[in-house]
Amino acid sequence: MRNGVVLFGLFFIGYSSCVLASLVEKSDVESTHAEQWDSNGKRTLQADDPERILAEERNMEQALLPAAEAIGKIKVSEKAVPRASLGSTLNPMKWPKRILDKVRLWLARIRLNLLKRTTVGEDSIDRAMMNGLTPFYLKKIKNDIMHYSSSVPHDKIKIEEDYDFYVKHFFGQFKGLYKDPPVFAVDKWNKLEEGMTKAEQNGNRRASDKVSRNIDKGLSIDQLFSLDISPFVYMRLLEKRGVFKDVENNMDKIDHLKDYVKVYKEHLMA
């Protein structure tokens, strides 16, 4: 049984490496189509197609997680393990969980690298926000990397700084919500939307449709939070519906958004 676990673990590690290498290579090749040069002659990466990024994540999970989870459920009899190795990192009883943790770490790393391509510069970050990228999604990736790494990640400080910057920038967009009367800087976002590629516009539309469906269902704040509905896309939806042009008759909708932003931030910081 022990030899079987060892052989299967080695096979899975090799297979996982091949799959991830092919996915990363494909992603890198495709991303060259999005490369441009700025006015200083430096190469920059513009936002990739959000749909392609989600598809790549699904492909990785479908290719790796089922097998990894199956390994994680393997039970190795303690009798099959020499007593001298029970407390060692080489203990075969610990291998299934270690393999599963390693796969989850790889997937989190791939997600982070894909997201870096969509958040190069403030405009790209704003486009990502419009397409529904939420602080909680980034927090999950950050936590997975920290949790499943066998030691402190070499780029821990950079990951934390990038996350903190995104969160600060994200909630900074709600300042106008607390003015009297509440306002929304529509011109900036409309101009940014006009400059989007068709793929980005489609991602923007899908994010708005998702929020619209759930808001129209009358879901509670807790239900919206459980679905990780973007407070920013929610605010843009209200603007598109003319709520901020008629504040007096729409204060109930604005107050609901304020409550949601408050709850969302509280849970995020918890």
From Swiss-Prot:
Short motif RxLR-dEER, span: 43-58
Gene Ontology CC terms, in alphabetical order: extracellular region; host cell cytoplasm; host cell nucleus
Subcellular location: Secreted; Host nucleus; Host cytoplasm
Top-level taxon of the source organism: Eukaryota
Signal peptide feature range: 1-21
Keyword Signal: yes
Keyword list, A-Z: Host cytoplasm, Host nucleus, Secreted, Signal, Virulence
Keyword Secreted on entry: yes
Transmembrane segments: none
Main subcellular location: secreted
Domain comment in the entry: The RxLR-dEER motif acts to carry the protein into the host cell cytoplasm through binding to cell surface phosphatidylinositol-3-phosphate.
Function comment: Secreted effector that completely suppresses the host cell death induced by cell death-inducing proteins.
Family (UniProt): Belongs to the RxLR effector family.
Official protein name in the record: Secreted RxLR effector protein 149
Chain's gene name: RXLR149
